[in-house]
């Protein structure tokens, strides 16, 4: 994705070989990720941004409450309505070689080089996430209350996901038909 042109206001703090820039950025959430049958976002969202320059590395922290964003999904646990706050943090440790750590109360995701990493919905897979190799593909962990097979396997999206390494699902109620 691309960061659109922004009108920036904020502050600059310089101390001991470190430069910290603080500002706000506005994003059209629909432009950040391609919509799929499983996930889409819509809304104009403001992020508090901190750019940190230290030891020749530029990192970026973004924080928002996603109040102006609607998240649609075939998975009920991932959906979010407009005007519902969901504090979300995004951290990019090195803008010259970006990886993305995204965290909120609903999910946690790490997207590394070549789109390797993980997506975890719910909090029941912390141990398994610590044991995976983030460089060998993309791992999906889903903790769901109720699950219909049709919700996830309704088309060939996963056949086209060449780096999908594993999918682990914990389900309270499974509806096969």
Positions of predicted regions on the chain:
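Membrane-proximal interfacial segments on either side of biological membranes
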Residues: 1-105, 111-177
């Amino acid at each position: 994705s691309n960061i659109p042109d922004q009108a920036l206001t904020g502050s600059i703090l310089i101390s001991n070989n470190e430069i910290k820039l603080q500002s706000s950025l506005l994003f059209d959430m629909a432009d950040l990720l391609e919509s799929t049958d499983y996930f889409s976002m819509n809304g104009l969202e403001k992020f508090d941004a901190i750019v940190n320059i230290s030891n020749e590395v530029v990192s970026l922290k973004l924080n928002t409450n996603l109040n102006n964003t609607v998240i649609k999904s075939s998975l009920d646990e991932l959906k979010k309505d407009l005007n519902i706050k969901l504090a979300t943090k995004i951290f990019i440790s090195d803008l010259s070689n970006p990886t993305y750590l995204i965290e909120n109360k609903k999910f946690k995701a790490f997207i590394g080089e070549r789109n390797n990493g993980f997506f975890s919905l719910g909090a029941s897979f912390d141990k398994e996430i610590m044991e995976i190799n983030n460089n060998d593909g993309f791992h999906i962990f889903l903790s769901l209350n109720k699950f219909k097979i049709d919700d996830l396997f309704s088309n060939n999206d996963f056949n086209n996901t060449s780096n999908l390494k594993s999918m682990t699902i914990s389900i309270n109620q499974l509806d096969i038909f």
